[in-house]
């Protein structure tokens, strides 16, 4: 049996891979695991705005209750809100039903422990064992008062909003902000946070209908936000993804700031305040060369992990560091929350703009981005490419052409049937050509997905 859990929980097309039956068995598995230490563990469940969310929420909650766990349903709420609230409200575990930046056809289920951290591999392996046992009807079925209860609490999102607002000491009064909620989990709470801090907020893509999450909007389709910022003569644009654990920004000139630039700005602020632990920022292998160079010039160190916020977080916890994240906009402020938090990230930068009395385009000038090209190859199989001689030769050839002024990175996606080809260096056209050559060979050798 293939492993259920990927790099960010269990994820797939709803009613094909991620069925309500699987959600039910995952609930029974999680209830069994967390029930080993407490007779009636209480779970907090949140979800994004996908049409399948309430169906999977019901199945997951039923599974948890069927083995004796209790459930509090928060409804539509960002992933980082669940991570925070589990810890702050004393829940025994949390679960989020979301496929993050993926299209609405997909959904996913991921769990958090009582400290708000995603589960380690060994616990996910145990849950998979319990899922198989549940499917074979081998797990306990308590009766009477051994069955768990379900409650609904729609106030929890407001507690999260209050928390985010109080991570800064600065009013945002005087700032005009365009907010793109990706028709996702922060469509209500995002505007609540920003307006509560005094900003003038123009909202776009905050009307979810179950089908429009991430559809030509949010952090994966930021073009509309760029236009809106300039149309409204705004100071800042903020884009979340579907579950609001990531954030990209747009400056007053319509230019995009990615996670590398956001981390650098926030890390420098922490350093100036004496709060940047180890004077170190944790990025990934996808971080831009310019990110590393700028950090060094500003007296900070950088570390690169594998792609995936779980690997960034793992390194941060092991080495007691303050800030880390991904170019895609997952930024973790470990002194505030235990996962990437799009709204928390956004208000840190907005506060910095107010404190420095500088437009974002000027603040972003501390880093010069090297051109970077990314080509995604949708493949029939994403395993075995590392051992393919033709693919290896194409990568070596490209690396030789770039020399010391650039690099090539090829990796399989952890969540989709993709192999990603990235090249970085001084010349955009050269990078595009090299990436396409490698991508063509990968497509031929691995087979293109239908």
Which residues make up each language-model segment?
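An N-terminal, well-structured beta->alpha segment
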Residues: 1-62, 66-68, 150-177
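Gly/Ser/Thr-enriched, mixed-charge loops and adjacent short helices
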Residues: 13, 107-232, 450
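Phosphate-binding and adjacent anionic-ligand microenvironments
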Residues: 236, 273-450
């Amino acid at each position: 049996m293939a492993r259920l859990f990927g790099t960010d929980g269990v994820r797939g097309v709803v009613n094909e891979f991620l069925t309500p039956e699987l959600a039910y068995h995952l609930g029974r598995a999680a209830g069994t695991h967390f029930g080993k230490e407490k007779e009636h563990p209480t779970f907090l469940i949140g979800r994004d705005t996908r049409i399948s969310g309430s169906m999977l929420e019901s199945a997951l909650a039923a599974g948890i209750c069927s083995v004796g766990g209790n459930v509090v349903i928060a409804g539509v709420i960002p992933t980082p809100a669940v991570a925070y609230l589990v810890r702050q409200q004393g829940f025994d575990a949390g679960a989020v039903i979301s496929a993050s930046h993926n299209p609405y056809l997909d959904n996913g289920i991921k769990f958090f422990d009582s400290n708000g951290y995603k589960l380690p591999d060994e616990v996910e392996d145990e849950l998979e064992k319990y899922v198989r046992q549940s499917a074979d009807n081998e797990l306990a079925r308590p009766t009477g008062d051994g069955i768990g209860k379900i409650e609904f609490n729609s106030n929890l999102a407001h507690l999260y909003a209050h928390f985010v607002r109080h991570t800064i000491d600065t009013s945002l009064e005087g700032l005009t902000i365009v907010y793109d909620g990706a028709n996702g989990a922060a469509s209500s709470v995002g505007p609540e946070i920003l307006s509560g801090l005094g900003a003038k907020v123009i909202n776009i893509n905050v009307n979810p209908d179950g089908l429009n999450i991430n559809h030509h909007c949010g952090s994966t389709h930021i073009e509309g936000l760029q236009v809106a910022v300039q149309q409204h003569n705004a100071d800042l644009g903020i884009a979340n993804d579907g579950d609001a654990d990531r954030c990209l920004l747009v400056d007053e000139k319509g230019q995009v700031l990615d996670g590398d630039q956001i981390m650098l700005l926030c890390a420098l602020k922490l350093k100036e305040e004496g709060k940047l632990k180890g004077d170190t920022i944790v990025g990934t292998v996808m971080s831009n060369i310019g990110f590393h160079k700028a950090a060094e010039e500003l007296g900070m160190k950088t570390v690169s992990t594998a792609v995936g916020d779980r690997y960034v977080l793992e390194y941060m916890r092991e080495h007691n560091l303050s800030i880390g994240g991904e170019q895609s906009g997952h930024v973790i402020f470990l002194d505030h929350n235990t996962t990437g938090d799009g709204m928390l990230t956004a208000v840190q930068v907005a506060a910095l703009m107010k404190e420095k009395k500088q437009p974002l385009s000027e603040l972003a000038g501390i880093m010069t981005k090297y051109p970077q090209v990314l080509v995604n190859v949708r493949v029939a199989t994403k395993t075995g490419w590392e051992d393919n001689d033709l693919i290896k030769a194409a990568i070596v050839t490209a690396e030789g052409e770039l020399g010391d002024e650039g690099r090539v990175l090829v990796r399989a996606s952890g969540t989709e049937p993709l192999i990603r080809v990235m090249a970085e260096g001084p010349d955009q056209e050269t990078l595009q050509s090299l990436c396409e050559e490698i991508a063509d060979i990968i497509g031929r050798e691995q087979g293109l997905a239908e």
